[in-house]
Amino acid sequence: MKIPSQPRVLNELRKLVSRNELDVRALARVINQDPGLTALLFKVVGSSAYRKHQPFATVEEILHAVGVEQTFNLVQAVALSSAGSIEKNRMAYEVFWARSHAIGQLAMLIADERIAVCNIFPDQAYLAGIFHDCGVPLLMQRFPTYCAEMKLGVHGTWIDLAEEDKKFNADHCVVGYLVARHWCLPEFICDAIRYHHAISELGVHEARSMVAIVQLAIDIHS
């Protein structure tokens, strides 16, 4: 099973951010190297969660208004959906990412409304929303019958964890956790991905609020 590699732009951004080189012009130049990521970033910050800052005309404006680390989180999220590709089950793959983006947007709005209570920021919620089921495409690639067995093309249905384990000896939550770790996501977001179907196993944990937000977003989307 091959974990998708991170785009070069993302690696360059991470190096700059980790060195605390927060020159907005330099960061914007790196992001602008990838027109696809840039377009997706503008689409995300067009959400009502960032209504206080809109409209944005440049990536520099986004970095100034939203924040460097927050923008980096958003870039990570949009990069994932364009990092891999699949030849078979193309329709199911596209439906999967449409669902993930919708849940990410809902999670972002929920976090924006509940930030004083949950202490989860919109960019973090969007990142978790996009990544929460990211193990699914890898299992689609690994197992030719995964889509059919998990009924991914059936409206209103989603993956049954017990059936997934029984038929494929796999857990998309664990696979997603490994992807998140490989992409160097914050630890509490990695844990939220791992336990987003088992919130009770987290106990008193900072990922618990994130799981609650993602699950509410899933319920609203359903």
What are these regions (language model features)?
Residues Y146-K151:
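A Zn2+-metalloprotease active-site environment signal
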Residues L152-T157:
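GAF sensory/regulatory domain recognition
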Residues M1-T145, I159-S222:
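Conserved alpha-helical "signature site"
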